[in-house]
Curated annotation (Swiss-Prot):
The keyword Nucleotide-binding applies. May be involved in cytokinesis. Residues 349-361 have a biased composition (Polar residues). It comes from Danio rerio (Zebrafish). This is Neuronal-specific septin-3. It is found in: Cytoplasm. GTP binds at residues 80-87, 114, 220-228, 276, 291. Residues 15-34 have a biased composition (Low complexity).
Length: 361
């Protein structure tokens, strides 16, 4: 009889020890816990030191490079009566001839019976960043004896740009980058009467502040004394408040206390009392943009003379991206929701087809 050999006894694999504490699921991003700081489970959570450099902060540089390569669109509309220096101010803001210069009507010419919409686009490059700037002018606004509802063509144009963007969004063969012709900012020029807003001013801002970012400015403010300017600005702010008109930046869209603090200062400054000029003068050994008067040169960028630099810094240097975001996230989304609700939704549009539904806005 053969000898029975007992089966070989193999060592059992080690069973990992059950953790003494199981952390609940968290939506916080994973952060490695530091080594050598104590017992198990310590050093986890937000604010813990990283073991080494990861590189997540390079996302800012990545975004910057993509923006510089692609560029961006910025569309500004100027509205106001003829002769208030709309084109000059826009050209001064962007330091180039970007706006068509309005011409004064001669006796032989007829003033347009309705408001016209004319736009011109330019590509501006600064520091490697390209911006396609489109300036939308509205000749004929407020120039009639009867100006009833003269804001309607402007409102129609703004909504048409929302409609154009919406149709591109629902297109089956949607472009990788949808051309953006939506109006991001409307500069509304108030005549420097020194008295109060006209009914036309109130009606325009009341209707248009619902669909576009309005920034009111007092044109040719050098025609007012400092005292008249201060009183006029206070009166305009009071009238806007009484009429329930909220210009940009609207209080309800302040994201945090820092935003609120910064925007409150801007709201207290509005309307901006501005002067525009494309002419240079020698002042104290320096070349400055300004307007020559009997009392001297009004320097455009001197904050003691006017608020042009405040307007420029606000509109371009601190709030340009926010103007675009409020346009997309608030005004356009409001239009989009109403459009879809009123028409039972939009069906996708093929590259060869057309959506026959028209906007009721």
């Amino acid at each position: 009889m053969s000898e029975i050999v007992p089966p070989e006894v193999r060592p059992k694999p080690a069973v990992p020890a059950k953790p003494s504490h199981v952390a609940p699921p968290s939506s916080a991003p994973f952060v490695p816990s530091p080594q050598g700081t104590g017992g198990e489970g310590q050093g986890s959570g937000r604010g813990s030191a990283l073991l080494g450099y990861i590189g997540i902060d390079t996302i800012i540089e990545q975004m910057r490079k993509k923006t510089m390569k692609a560029g961006f669109d910025f569309n500004i509309m100027v509205v106001g009566q003829s002769g208030l220096g709309k084109s000059t101010l826009v050209n001064t803001l962007f330091k180039s001839q970007v706006s068509r210069r309005s011409t004064s009507w001669s006796r032989d010419e007829k003033i347009p019976k309705t408001v016209e919409i004319k736009s011109v686009s330019h590509v501006i490059e600064e520091g490697g960043v390209k911006m396609k700037l489109t300036v939308v002018d509205t000749p004929g606004f407020g120039d009639q004896i009867n100006n009833d509802n003269c804001w309607e063509p402007i409102s129609k144009h703004i909504n048409e740009q929302y409609e154009k963007f919406l149709k591109e969004e629902v297109n089956i063969a949607r472009k990788k980058r949808i051309p953006d012709t939506r109006v991001h900012c409307c500069l509304y020029f108030i005549s420097p009467t020194g008295h109060s807003l006209r009914q036309l001013d109130i009606e325009f801002m009341k209707h248009l502040s619902r669909v576009v970012n309005i920034i009111p400015v007092i044109a040719k403010s050098d025609t007012l004394t400092p005292e008249e300017k201060t009183e006029f600005k206070q009166r305009v702010r009071k009238e806007l408040e009484v009429c329930g008109i909220e210009c940009y930046p609207q209080k309800e869209f302040d994201e945090d206390m820092e935003d609120k603090s910064d925007n409150d200062k801007i709201r207290e400054t509005m309307p901006f009392a501005v002067v525009g000029s494309d002419k240079e003068y020698q002042v104290n050994g320096k070349r400055v943009l300004g307007r020559k008067t009997a009392w001297g040169v009004v320097e455009v960028e001197n904050p003691n003379h006017c608020e042009f630099s405040l307007l420029r810094d606000f509109m371009i240097r601190s709030h340009l991206q926010d103007l675009k975001e409020v346009t997309h996230n608030i005004h356009y989304e409001t239009y989009r929701a109403k459009r879809l609700n009123d028409n039972g939704g939009l069906h996708p549009i093929s590259s060869s087809g057309h959506d026959t539904q028209e906007s009721n806005l």
